[in-house]
């Protein structure tokens, strides 16, 4: 593995343990050339998962797209990047546990909203407004009213 500091092609593993999600291994490495220490994660290669979009087109599942949407919805909100990453991890795990080769973008969107709602309601509303494509202000207010009813 290339050292991120000196780009030498050689490192040794100092420590290895399961990552928090149980789906990967976290390894601490040390460059044999410069002694720089860095962390890598090893994951098994998964079978391709296709997302069926609203228009019927298919594209390969991309966890980064989920994370980008979460970051946009939580902009200027007190939600850490670590928390958003964990949400993306949970959503990906839920999607993969379905055991299907294809999953609709609607299912993924619902999973994201279920994870985001208890974390930050403003970020949730922002995400929902894009995901559900509110046509007007009334649709926006209906979503807020439904949230209020659930709190009671």
Curated annotation (Swiss-Prot):
It holds the Pfam family ATP-cone. Keywords: ATP-binding, DNA-binding, Metal-binding, Nucleotide-binding, Repressor, Transcription, Transcription regulation, Zinc, Zinc-finger. It comes from the Bacteria. One of its GO terms (biological process) is negative regulation of DNA-templated transcription. One of its GO terms (molecular function) is DNA binding. Belongs to the NrdR family. Negatively regulates transcription of bacterial ribonucleotide reductase nrd genes and operons by binding to NrdR-boxes. This is Transcriptional repressor NrdR. It comes from Limosilactobacillus fermentum (strain NBRC 3956 / LMG 18251) (Lactobacillus fermentum).
